[in-house]
Curated annotation (Swiss-Prot):
GO cellular component, one term: cytosol
Superkingdom, natural source: Bacteria
Functional summary from the UniProt entry: Catalyzes the conversion of GTP to 2,5-diamino-6-ribosylamino-4(3H)-pyrimidinone 5'-phosphate (DARP), formate and pyrophosphate.
Protein name from the UniProt record: GTP cyclohydrolase-2
Amino acid sequence: MTKVRARIELSVGQHSNIPAEMLSFEGLETEKEHVAIVFNQADKTQKTPLVRMHSECLTGDVFHSSRCDCGEQLEESINKMAISGGIILYLRQEGRGIGLYNKLDAYELQSKGMNTYEANNHLGFGDDLRDFKEAAQMLGALNINTIKLVTNNPKKIKDIQDYGITLDEVVHTHAHVKKGNENYLQSKVDHGHQLDLDK
């Protein structure tokens, strides 16, 4: 059974000025060190909180890589939840589940003309190896079963519902287009992501 292990206060965001709490967990199936970042005590004060399931992206989240939009999506979610409350489930699923080194191998292939999915497939991986069962377990540990999910990804929508979480609403993030990620974003759209690249 999954339960909260520790709950600590910290300030987050680009200027470390947004109050939040970080939660660790016991009893997750794979024992990966996923965490939840809770804003405005949303797990205690809201019946249907905003939730983003954000998969770790070292290159984008930490180093602000031009190749993806992960860091911008994370920052958008933090800023949104600072106002309205919410929960970010930060999941250790680098590279859509293939790991950091394999993702860097995929980047090499992308530099030679493959898109993000073709590169993963060429390395012997599926389009997306992530599983969101542990995200549902984390929500269960917080006694949350209905959420407003912040995502553009149809797989996340399907998977979290398959694990028993009810979606009250799907909230899309903006399209964060910048030099270097245009092909990546177009590939996501081609795979069903709800992104308006014309804005």
